[in-house]
């Protein structure tokens, strides 16, 4: 049960994001069970994304820092990828099976969850 705030850097085939603060980078490291951002792997992790308007959708992330960064004081060197159902990679424009498996895992985990006293209903089809 960890949560972090992210900055959306860019969108396209999938969403490129970065931790908003140094504390959020620490949380991301905890999610991956590592002590520093340089040790975070490309292993996919199922997540529940909650937007600023309260909309919740399941997604998958790989936390490995890569590419450009917008925020210089968050102790994170670059960005990481956030994938939704049927999102594609930038390089090959293909759906990543490992991200899709993590999303399905998130569905099975979240379909029986209550968060802040509210039963979460997970939709696997996004508008």
Q: Where on the chain are the PLM-derived regions?
A:
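Conserved small-residue-rich
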Residues: 1, 122-127
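Active-site acidic/histidine clusters and adjacent loop/turn architecture
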Residues: 2-5, 10-15
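Exported/periplasmic cell-wall-interacting domains
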Residues: 14-122
């Amino acid at each position: 049960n960890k949560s972090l705030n992210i900055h959306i850097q860019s969108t396209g085939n999938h969403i490129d994001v970065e931790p908003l603060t140094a504390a959020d980078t620490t949380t991301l490291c905890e999610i991956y069970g590592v002590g520093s951002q340089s040790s975070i792997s490309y292993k996919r992790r199922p997540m529940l994304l909650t937007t600023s308007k309260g909309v919740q959708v399941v997604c998958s992330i790989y936390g490995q820092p890569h590419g450009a960064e917008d925020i210089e004081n968050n102790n994170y060197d670059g960005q990481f990828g956030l994938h939704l159902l049927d999102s594609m990679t930038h390089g090959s424009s293909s759906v990543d099976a490992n991200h899709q498996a993590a999303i399905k895992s998130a569905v099975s985990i979240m379909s029986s969850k209550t968060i802040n006293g509210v039963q979460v209903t997970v939709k696997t089809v996004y508008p």
